[in-house]
Amino acid sequence: MAKFPDKRARVCLFFRTLFRMRYKVTLVNVECLNQPGSKLVWPTHMAVIDPMLVFAELYKYPLQPFVDERFFANGVFRSILKVFDSISVPNLRKSRNGLEQAKQLNNLCLASLQAGKTVIFYPSGHCTSDGKESLGGRNMAHTMAQIMPDETRVIGVKIRGLWGSCTSRYGRKGTPPIFPTMFTNLWKLFVPRRKVTMEFEDITDMVRSWKGLEKTEFNHNLEEYYNSKGIDEPKTR
């Protein structure tokens, strides 16, 4: 298992201690992250809290995340993100140079994999609005499947138990702001902990078998994998 700086460990363990007051997290088959070599980690995105939960629970693993550029605008966030060697992701839809920036992101991801790192990004790029994982026209997962090094393993992560929570889009038109939402729901620390499951699976062979597919079909197959167990029953407490 790879080692990482003490500062990263302290940040992760701080949030893990905090989150475990509210969430009872079960990790299934997390051992697949112990495989040698570079890895791509592709989780589902059920709520705005799940990236923080993933990092808190995987404190033993040196994950390098791709993070929305908006979070780098905040000084506190930026200092934390630097600890994790985070890569800023611009809003490609609003950028005049979207295509070129997408290529740069792909190249950065490839360089990290070639250096043996474990890169994590969310193929859908957004929180689900209906409990299902939907990639739409997203490009990055499809592109990385074409160009990732031969030794890279792809790890799928299905997260269950967060749909319907205050940090999900259940019953909302948009994505809730993470910290204001957490602060206004502090009273939930005094109710039974919410059960969350993170199921890890090595899907490398499956992803490689889709390598020659067009983006639309590739994304559809990945959606079917993510949604194979159906939609979580929404729980609001």
Predicted regions and their residues:
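Alpha-helical membrane-targeting segments
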Residues: 1-22, 73-85, 165-194
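Helix-to-loop junction immediately C-terminal to a conserved catalytic motif
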Residues: 13-45
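Catalytic core of membrane glycerolipid acyltransferases/transacylases, capturing the structured
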Residues: 34-100
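Residue-level preference for the first positions of well-ordered beta-strands
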Residues: 38-40, 116-120, 153
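Short, well-ordered beta-to-alpha junction loops that form the rim of enzyme active sites
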Residues: 44, 122-126, 159
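Short, charged beta->alpha transition segments
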Residues: 75-77, 105-113
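Catalytic-site beta-strand/loop segments enriched in glycine and acidic/polar residues
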Residues: 110-142
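A cross-family acyltransferase "interaction/gating" segment
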Residues: 129-212
